[in-house]
Amino acid sequence: MKNDQIINGLNEYIGDRYQPCEYPALRQQATEWSESKPLAGIRILDNTPLFTNTLLKYIPLLSGGAELTLAISERTPYDSSLIPVMRSLGIRVIENCNQGDFDCILDCGGSHAHLKPRYGYAELTRSGYYHYKDTELPVILVDDSRIKAIETCLGTGDGFLRAMKQLGHKDFTNRKIIVFGFGKVGCGIVYYAMKEGAEVRIVDEPGTLIPPGTELISRYDSDAIAAAVRQAWCVVTATGIRDAMLQNGAAEEILAGKQLVAAMGIENEWGSSLPEERILNHNIPLNFILEEPTRLRYIDPTMALSNVAALALLSGKIPPGVNRIAPETEKFYMDIVEMKD
């Protein structure tokens, strides 16, 4: 009964912000789990970044019978105005959780790798992998999936572009942008910047395959990096690696110049080499200045995968260490999204 009341409160708060077609995976998950109750009595700690569209992730968990606790970590961006709203609805919220008795932890960025849940963890991000790679408990890396690749590339790239425009930087035409890291996040940023007419240079490993019309700079060539940064309109970091920007020549050029600097990785890539005020959004991923950092249509199946990972952990069939989500599970949710389209 309590979960039903919380769900009603969440639905009332969300109102008509989103159309059902924007979250087919979570909607079907909630419908199915409200009947089967696969999480009845299961204590779940969820550290998905708290924003309005994240509230739709909680509905399937609550529908499934979970005892849900939300984690707020200083390492993970969130909308602080939602904390009192969640508490008023009866959802437990813990800030900087250092202890607790949980069955499953649905984590982001490895913020709760220090806790020991009964069944294991699901981790949303690639950066979180480095916090879990040596764990003796089962971990499902949601990031290691086609669904997450689509969200991270298209959703985060779109978020970068929307955030830049919200800050007034609307004209990319013939502007020089240098992107550090050409993984899933960097790929999306490059895609959207090129669509807007920017001249893009990419810093990554020698031999990295890059799109036509861009230029690759070796991450080991500090002279070339310094020269490119000196000429850049905007410098974007998307390596996902802590301190990745130390001693590569970029910081010195930025301190002497007027380049825009955007961080798009959850880890602190600049370390102590740049003051926070020199980086847009104070070195927090730039898309998190937006009310909707990643559009719901991109993040819906990813959040559904994070939820269903709890069921896989409860099965007891996931071995210790880092694991992929089962291919048939990912296909199930991908098919739901593709049918919507």
Please provide the spans of the model-predicted regions:
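ADP-ribose/adenylate-binding Rossmann-like module
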Residues: 106-107, 117-130, 234-280, 300
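NAD(P)-binding Rossmann-fold cofactor-contacting core
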Residues: 68-82, 180, 195-213
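Glycine-rich adenosine-cofactor-binding loop
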Residues: 40-54, 168-194, 204
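Glycine/serine-rich phosphate-binding loop and adjoining beta1-alpha1 elements at the start
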Residues: 1-39, 72-173
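Short acidic low-complexity segments
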Residues: 91-101, 205-231
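Histidine-anchored nucleotide/phosphate-binding helix
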Residues: 50-66
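Adenosine-phosphate binding glycine-rich loop
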Residues: 11-27, 141-172, 260-341
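A short helix->loop->beta-strand "cap" motif at the edges of active sites that frequently abuts
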Residues: 64-67, 91, 117-119, 135-137, ...
